[in-house]
From Swiss-Prot:
PANTHER family cross-referenced by the UniProt entry: UVRABC SYSTEM PROTEIN C, UVRC/OXIDOREDUCTASE
Gene3D superfamilies: 5' to 3' exonuclease, C-terminal subdomain (1.10.150.20), GIY-YIG endonuclease (3.40.1440.10), UVR domain (4.10.860.10), UvrC, RNAse H endonuclease domain (3.30.420.340)
Domain GIY-YIG: 6-84
Subcellular compartments: Cytoplasm
GO CC terms: cytoplasm; excinuclease repair complex
A Pfam match: GIY-YIG
UniProt similarity note: Belongs to the UvrC family.
UVR domain ranges (all copies): 194-229
Listed NCBIfam families: PRK00558.1-5 (NF001824), uvrC (TIGR00194)
UniProt keyword Cell division, yes or no: no
Top-rank lineage group of the source organism: Bacteria
Protein's UniProt name: UvrABC system protein C
Gene that specifies this protein: uvrC
Organism: Brucella abortus (strain 2308)
Subunit description: Interacts with UvrB in an incision complex.
Amino acid sequence: MKRLPNNPGVYRMFNSDGGVLYVGKARNLKKRVSNYARGIGHSNRITRMIRETVTMEFVVTRTETEALLLEANLIKRLRPRFNVLMRDDKSFPYILLTGGHRAPGIFKHRGARSRKGDYFGPFASAGAVGRTINALQRAFLLRTCTDSVFETRTRPCLLYQIKRCSAPCTYEISDEDYAGLVAEAKAFLSGKSQSVKDHLAAAMQAASADLDFEHAAVYRDRLAALSHVQSHQGINPQTVEEADVFAIHQEGGMTCIQVFFFRTGQNWGNRAYFPKADSSLGPAEVLGAFLSQFYDDKPCPKLVLLSETVEEQSLITEALSTRAGHKVQVSVPQRGEKKELVQHALTNAREALGRRLAETSSQARLLQGLAETFGLPRAPRRIEVYDNSHIMGTNAVGGMIVAGPEGFVKNQYRKFNIRSTDITPGDDFGMMREVIERRFSRLVKEHGTPAGEVKNPDAFPAWPDVILIDGGQGQVGAVRQILGEMGISDLVTAIGIAKGVDREAGRERFFMEGKQPFTLPPRDPVLYFIQRLRDEAHRFAIGTHRARRKKEIVRNPLDEIAGIGPTRKRALLHHFGTAKAVSRAAVEDLMQIDGISEAMARAIHDHFRDK
């Protein structure tokens, strides 16, 4: 301890197994560790943490702000047991208006901003983005097809017929007029909604005055679509241009933080978070820790409104400003419209936490009921459900969904593209065998056996207590055999669900090792629970299969050629128009394109001639 510096920095506390218990930051590392060492005046949580700590590691930083940023990054990456943890850290969706194309498209986008274009967001959910894009299609008639589909169209698609697209692909609209629609969409998404609506209203009146009622009806429908967007946005504040609103509510040992997003003066939705935090921590501590992590990989607006004054608020403000590259104001409003926004968020936080507490209580009863029904030693903490999806063996996929004490755990869902070439098309049995082998081989490799998880009871387990599979005694026996070959058959309970007579819900038969098949009473809550798990697995597997099939359908033939990336493909399609025209081109013609060497031109030419 004597060698510790009096500098700001970050410290990590480890238990006897090398697991990270806690990540913290300090203005003075020496004083902070000395405070821990005194062992008096600590809360029960801190006392437990110190008792389990056997070693510590330190990183000295230049400033306390730098320490706060590093701490947030390490907490999100290491997920220590005693820190406040964000449970749902899925990236936010955006609306993307693509650039670098004669006819920009409008798309939902999630993840890194690698594509050229204008991004609008964040939106709170994919559903909010979908509804907005749906309405914007009707209002501005922008395309939503991929570039590869766009380049190969020879006639307008159905969306043109139902007035959801202006068909720039086949020049049903001029590039100049389409650019005008794109500019209007950008203006609307940038907060100039009233000027766009005024322009459309004026155009409608002018068309009506000229007795051009057909065009007047088009403008009327576009205005209605924009009004539909705004009606779904709820509160649209007049004095708040860009802000995120955070409100926290604690009850029953749980915490809910409700976040509302306002951009360009419009409400772009909200999302409820239920961070993992010790029940001894108050709202100011939890909200401060949450805020430090929240913007680690997200853009921060100029204004952040809070329902509580958080610990080290000035330091957090400085850290957010540093990360965002612009000045960020963090405040707790006391009056006016901003106060109303916070109160609205707080009301939503209370309601969301109330629903969560009721759902958690119900889920606990169902898990206990499942344990009693199937003779399990305790209520399962992790259930995995498997299902396959394919059409005559093509684009075959397996899906795994996960459920626990708090419902479905979607960040644990997994997709499996069936790789085996020796599986007969439509062989569900063989597909399930591959999925189970791959899942548990990786589980053993990454986590060892379940014995190591007992030491951290607060963490969501990596190993399932129960796996549910679609099938009867044969499927259960096969799964048990696979697990037995891996030496883990005694660690997991496998349950088969066979559809009832005429595939009627409520008449399912259940199969377990060493037991006779049995059914459950039609109104048994456990039966409904299992049906819900099975239906979720089915939904997930079918969705995965459809996505893979769609990708196969829209795949451009140029994607099959080694060395043809997005840039070369775009250059070829820009010059020749379609992939079919590229396939007919001579080597000399291909060499005229920038970036296409003679060797590449011959590779393209030979690829299509060899087919």
